């Protein structure tokens, strides 16, 4: 094997380690880096929390009450979802500075940046946000009305290019939920209620973002919310205690699973379980991420999914905005007990959490085997290597960003786009259970 004459000496030891060698197999690089990581570094990698572009030494007004430097340098966190963002050009410059700070840490593990949708007209933190400089497209429900896989895949390809231009490598979407409860507030983030349509468009969406597979030019999709967030009891919000239950009066739990198998076949490597409790569907009425029958038995074993399972945001500890932890069904457990239960269920990463200390303490206290952390960290490292972040996490000038916008690849409502007649009335389909979730 040829030895590179130049390399990124990420651990600053003056020699080429296997994990720094781009010519070695990914699995070999993963194992080498894993062997060099401390317990604290492993626990930090399992956090996936919010960050606001800006100064690294200022506590932001919204999000975790801790500086970016503290999270990256001292807590060893290297997965972040961006909240508010300046223009695309400013975001790209900030991203490179963030990667430079990560490069200077002990092992130089690069940052993975994720985001909720950035291409719609709404501006709702935690659901979808506009970003100046990106092209504008319909919400997923609008794509559902168009019903064209080619249009959705084209959108995904354009959005992929725009995400790459500013450093976003994980899309916290698509939503593969079936909106069978018309009062549910997240309907606009879905492709609709009809499983066949949602299945086709979800797979097309993933193909657009990931291409032939997640690599240096792909954006990894985190499909959500397994096993389907649509049957929300009374349409209430599962972020809150009063909306923690999912109901299936039509006994259609299996119907809501239909889009996920094809999503995995399309290459989705990350999954986010839903907040809610699937009432009466498993032996224990607890939230999805705490439910071993949902995560291990259904997702891991039945579907054979071996990718990353990242919880929805704030299921273990609450945030400073006054929202309690969404630990539905296990509210009585301590923080450490909640971590143990989710790990036993089979999750890999914790959305919205920025305190890795309880995980490390569980190992120190003899209540958790470090090998269990290794299992999840392997998955997280593997994806970073596949995306090429260890070889070059930085991005170049974004002066060509407008070339990716609608003028080059026009959305279907622009005059230059081909027209497609859509029937003014769409009869209900027998396969859709509608509100009978």
Which residues fall in each region the model found?
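Active-site-proximal beta-strand/loop segments in catalytic clefts of secreted hydrolases
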Residues: 46-52, 81-86, 115-118, 173-177, ...
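Glycine-rich tight-turn/loop motif centered on a GG-T
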Residues: 81-85, 131-150, 182-201, 235-254, ...
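Flexible hinge/switch segments at interdomain interfaces of large molecular machines
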Residues: 128-134, 173-180, 227-236, 390-402, ...
């Amino acid at each position: 094997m040829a030895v590179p004459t130049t390399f990124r000496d990420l651990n600053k030891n003056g020699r080429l380690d296997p994990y720094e060698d781009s010519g070695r197999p990914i699995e070999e690089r993963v194992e080498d880096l894993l062997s060099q990581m401390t317990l604290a570094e492993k626990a930090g990698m399992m956090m996936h929390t919010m960050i606001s572009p800006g100064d690294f030494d200022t506590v932001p007004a919204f999000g975790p009450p801790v500086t970016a430097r503290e999270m990256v340098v001292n807590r060893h966190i290297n997965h972040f979802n961006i909240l508010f963002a300046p223009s695309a050009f400013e975001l790209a410059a900030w991203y490179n500075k963030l990667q430079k700070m990560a490069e200077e840490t002990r092992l130089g593990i690069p940052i993975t940046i994720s985001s909720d949708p950035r291409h719609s007209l709404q501006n709702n933190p935690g659901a979808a946000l506009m970003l100046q400089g990106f092209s504008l497209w319909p919400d997923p429900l609008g794509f559902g009305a168009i019903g064209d896989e080619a249009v959705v895949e084209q959108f995904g390809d354009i959005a992929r290019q725009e995400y790459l231009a500013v450093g976003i490598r994980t899309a916290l979407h698509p939503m593969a939920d079936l909106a069978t409860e018309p009062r549910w507030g997240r309907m606009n983030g879905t492709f609709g209620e009809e499983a066949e349509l949602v299945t086709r468009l979800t797979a097309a969406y993933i193909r657009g973002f990931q291409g032939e597979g997640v690599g240096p030019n792909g954006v990894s999709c985190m499909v959500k919310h397994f096993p389907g967030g649509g049957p929300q009891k009374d349409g209430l919000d599962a972020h809150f205690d009063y909306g923690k239950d999912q109901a299936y009066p039509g006994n259609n739990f299996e119907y809501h699973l239909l889009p996920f198998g094809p999503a995995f076949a399309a290459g989705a490597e990350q999954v986010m379980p839903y907040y809610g409790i699937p009432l009466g569907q498993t032996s224990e009425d607890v939230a999805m991420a705490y439910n071993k029958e949902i995560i291990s038995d259904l997702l891991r074993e039945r579907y054979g999914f071996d990718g990353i399972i990242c919880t929805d945001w704030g299921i273990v500890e609450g945030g400073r905005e006054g929202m309690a932890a969404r630990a539905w069904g296990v509210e009585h457990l301590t923080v450490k007990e909640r971590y143990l239960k989710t790990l036993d269920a089979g999750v890999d990463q914790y959305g919205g959490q920025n305190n890795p200390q309880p995980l490390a303490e569980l190992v120190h206290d003899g209540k958790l085997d470090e090998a269990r952390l290794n299992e999840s960290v392997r998955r997280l490292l593997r994806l970073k290597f596949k995306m090429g972040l260890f070889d070059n996490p930085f991005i170049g000038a974004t002066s060509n960003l407008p070339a990716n916008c609608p003028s080059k690849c026009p959305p279907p409502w622009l005059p230059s786009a081909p027209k497609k007649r859509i029937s003014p009335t769409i009869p209900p389909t027998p396969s859709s259970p509608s509100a009978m979730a």
